Amino acid sequence: MNAELKQDLTEFLRLSLVDDEFIEQYIDDITALLETQGEWADGYVYWQEKGILPEDPEHQYYDEYFDWDENAFVVDGKSYPSLSLADILEQQALSKLTDWKFDAEELEYAVNSMLTNKIKIQCPEETYNDALYPYVQQALAPQNYTLCNYWNGNDSCLFMIFSFEEYERIREIAGKWNISICVVDGGE
């Protein structure tokens, strides 16, 4: 196992506000999965390879094992979370998943769901989608925050908020390990 990857992933997940207990319990599995399959790894296949789930190359029994309320695979009453980075950031981190189409009110709601000190997006009427990004960044700047999007492989946005200082480290780790997260700026 790549010790440097494990250390960087641990820091990345902590900066993303993933619970320390979750990180400690699964960091070896998360590291192995990212190392072998990348950030959109298939947790279903991973738990099959570990012998937890029965072999199912066609994914015929996925729904039989996946509990949508727990966001985990359940076998004999025990839960095994999907450990792809995309799923962890959506389910365990401080993040908000939205459709890729949104207006100012929807984006403001998504961002405020992650903040203690709420913001108000000041923008021209009829401003939508990524054209809103400069306005939300302007609203976040006084709090020393920046809005980021983790591209999760779908036609949705997985928004996350970091302080400017935290984002510098997030950017370093993401660049080193090909993790698809970036500041939203309207030029995407």
From Swiss-Prot:
Pfam families: DUF6630
Superkingdom in the source lineage: Bacteria
InterPro entries the record matches: DUF6630
Name of the protein in its database record: Uncharacterized protein PM0111
